[in-house]
């Protein structure tokens, strides 16, 4: 009986998940209107940017040349993301581009998500410490009231080959970890020494008896 109940609950949860995500599964990137103008300019003049240190100035606004300038009336939120360029997707299926938005893995790093403002927006973004080494561009999505993407814009061309920038990730070497490692090493040595002294004292007491 318990097994049947568990199976029923599992199927119910699965069906609820499917129904809630069904709308997103039908949405294709090629159906979105390219009506947002996005730029991404590293503050550093040249060279590879360092994660956790260097900054990128990002701007976005509705394209004035858009055939449907009123498309922004559907926007409730603007979501800006950092996306992998094709060169950083080679042999990395977990970063693959897919026309089905719910399957697309090319833009996993959210930079900012905020209420839509019709006036041109700008952001000086410091590259996060969690950003891996790679080549990137920036993409912005216009999100409607139901949480669906209805428009987009990106800082590169359609082939994602221009206006790219490269990031070098931190090595993962932290002073805090070194201190912790040293502390535990010393603690282990001291503990071993104390254990040795106690055992030796115990042996002497046994000999006297």
UniProtKB/Swiss-Prot annotation:
The entry lists its GO molecular-function terms as:
nitrate transmembrane transporter activity
* UniProt subcellular location: Cell membrane
Keywords recorded for this protein, A-Z: Cell membrane, Membrane, Nitrate assimilation, Signal, Transmembrane, Transmembrane helix
One of the protein's GO biological processes:
nitrate assimilation
Alphabetical GO CC annotations of the entry are: plasma membrane
Transmembrane spans: 177-197
Tissue specificity comment: Bearly detected in roots and shoots.
Q: Where is the signal peptide?
A: 1-22
InterPro entries given for it? Transptr_NO3_Nar2
Pfam families registered for this protein in UniProt? NAR2
Give the record's membrane topology. Answer: Single-pass membrane protein
Induction context: Not regulated by nitrate.
What task does this protein carry out?
Acts as a dual component transporter with NTR2.1. Required for high-affinity nitrate transport.
Which protein family is it in? Belongs to the NAR2 family.
PANTHER family cross-referenced by the UniProt entry: HIGH-AFFINITY NITRATE TRANSPORTER 3.2 (PTHR34806:SF13)
**Protein's name in the database:** High-affinity nitrate transporter 3.2
């Amino acid at each position: 009986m318990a097994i049947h109940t568990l199976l029923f609950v599992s199927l119910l949860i699965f069906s609820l998940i499917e129904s809630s995500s069904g709308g997103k599964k039908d949405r294709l990137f090629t159906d979105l209107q390219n009506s947002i103008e996005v730029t991404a300019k590293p503050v550093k003049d040249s060279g590879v940017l360092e994660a956790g240190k260097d900054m990128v100035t990002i701007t976005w606004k509705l394209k004035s040349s858009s055939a449907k300038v009123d498309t922004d009336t559907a926007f409730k939120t603007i979501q800006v993301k950092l996306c992998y360029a094709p060169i950083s997707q080679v042999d990395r299926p977990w970063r693959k581009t897919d026309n089905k938005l719910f399957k697309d893995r090319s833009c996993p790093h959210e930079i900012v998500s905020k209420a839509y403002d019709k006036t041109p927006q700008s952001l000086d973004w410091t590259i996060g410490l969690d950003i891996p080494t790679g080549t990137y561009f920036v993409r912005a999505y216009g999100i409607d009231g139901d949480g669906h993407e209805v428009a987009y814009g990106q800082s590169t061309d359609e082939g994602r080959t221009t206006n790219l920038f490269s990031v070098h990730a931190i090595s993962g070497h932290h002073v805090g970890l070194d201190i912790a490692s040293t502390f535990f090493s010393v603690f282990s040595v001291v503990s071993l020494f104390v254990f040795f002294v106690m055992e030796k004292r115990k042996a002497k007491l046994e000999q006297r008896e």
